[in-house]
Amino acid sequence: MARVCEICGKGKQNGHSVSHSNIKTKRSFNANLQNVKIEVNGSVKKALVCTKCIKGNKISKAK
């Protein structure tokens, strides 16, 4: 299972680490994903969801 948000599809992005002497090395920026129990069609399932979707009320948390 890939580290991708199941709601919006947000995943890993690539970029550079830049040192003081301006040397650039490749690095990756991971999305802030959390395991959350969500309610889908009346049933409860676990899903990897980014914090932006959690805070934006794009999911309904299971109680």
Curated annotation (Swiss-Prot):
InterPro entries: Bacterial_rp_bL28, Ribosomal_bL28, Ribosomal_bL28/bL31-like_sf, Ribosomal_bL28_bact-type, Ribosomal_bL28_sf
GO annotation terms (biological process): translation
GO CC terms: ribonucleoprotein complex; ribosome
One Gene Ontology molecular-function label: structural constituent of ribosome
Keywords: Ribonucleoprotein, Ribosomal protein
Family membership: Belongs to the bacterial ribosomal protein bL28 family.
Stated name of the protein: Large ribosomal subunit protein bL28
Species whose genome carries this gene: Brachyspira hyodysenteriae (strain ATCC 49526 / WA1)
Gene expressing this chain: rpmB
